[in-house]
A protein has these predicted regions:
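Hydrophobic packing and interface segments
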Residues: 1-322
Length: 322
């Protein structure tokens, strides 16, 4: 209920101050406003309901301040995952720019880079969730972990509203194009569409992160109900499960990215030999001339082609691939 209230109030902070300001900044302002409001009202609510009462959860004595700090952990984890997702999906950051640049090398290079980037992004959110699990346990015991999930989901209404921004802006761009509106209108809708794609990715990252934290809660609760004397009750074990599962994706991403990087370097190295003045370029031009005229190379052209083959730097290409 508190989350719904602050999300409604936060919508009034989503305003673009001028044409130069990115719509993403305005949307982020709404999210952060909702998070701050939720944190403050949660403290008031916890103090009113819990007061000075304390209880023991998971061997840790928990009070109202501990529960509030657990909520702050959840809010911080959600904000961190959202910001990291924006860094990996927004066109103003280096990763997306490098991905677009790799498209100039061909679809294979683009796909390799894209797959590596997508797999690598699983690692940092897992670290954030692992840290949030441990911190929430230190502040609120086992009960602090679900409370942290509540903190992460406290601004869910605002996140879902921003997630809906993507298809709305996309449809606006389609209508503008079909209506034959001016180029300036289409430029604005394209800008909004780009931000919409980012907000959609942020919403998915936020949802997946909160679902992962909820899964940790269910695992701990199951172990407790079944009275299982195993380390699953330890938040360190749960954090280790999250990090360990993501390490596979991280190392796979590094391996795939190395293949793409080596391929791009190989392409640049070979193209440079054909573009620089010398025997290789002369041989390439002689061969293309014969193909264009649909004939076999003349004896003079064969001499030039053989000279180009001998002058080619094969060792440099082998060094790149090995």
């Amino acid at each position: 209920a508190v989350g719904m209230l602050v999300s409604v109030i936060a919508t009034y902070f989503v305003k673009v101050k001028n044409e130069k300001e990115s719509p993403q900044i305005a949307l982020n302002r709404g999210v952060y406003s909702a998070a701050i409001g939720f944190a403050l009202l949660s403290l008031v609510l916890i103090k009113y309901v819990i007061g000075d009462m304390t209880f023991v959860s998971g061997g840790i004595e928990v009070g109202s301040w501990g529960l509030w700090l657990a909520i702050l952990v959840g809010i911080g984890a959600g904000a961190a995952i959202g910001h990291y997702t924006e860094m990996k999906c927004s066109a103003k950051y280096q990763d997306v720019q490098d991905l677009a640049k790799s498209a100039t090398d061909g679809p294979a290079s683009l796909f390799t880079k894209m797959l590596a980037l997508g797999m690598a992004t699983a690692f940092v959110p897992a670290l954030i969730l692992a840290a949030a699990t441990i911190a929430a346990y230190q502040f609120g015991g086992l009960y602090g972990i679900p409370i942290a999930a509540v903190g992460m989901l406290g601004t869910l209404n605002m996140q879902l509203a921003i997630d809906a921004y993507g298809p709305i802006s996309d449809n606006a761009g389609g209508i503008a194009e079909m209506a034959g509106l001016g180029e300036n209108v289409r430029e604005k809708t394209d800008k909004l569409d780009a931000v919409g794609n980012t907000t959609a990715a942020i919403g998915k990252g936020f949802a997946i992160g909160s679902a992962a934290l909820t899964a940790v809660i269910m695992l701990v609760n199951y172990a407790g109900k079944m009275q299982m004397d195993v380390s699953l009750l330890s938040p360190w074990a749960c954090a280790g499960l999250l990090v360990g599962a993501s390490v596979t994706f991280k190392f796979s991403a590094l391996a795939i990215d190395s293949v793409g990087t080596a391929g791009a370097q190989m392409k640049d190295f070979i193209v440079k030999q054909f573009e620089d003045d010398g025997p290789v370029k002369d041989a390439f031009e002689a061969l293309n001339k014969a193909k264009a005229e649909k004939r076999d190379p003349t004896p003079e052209e064969l001499v030039i082609i053989e000279a180009g083959k001998r002058a080619a730097d094969y060792k440099g290409a082998i060094a790149i691939s090995t």
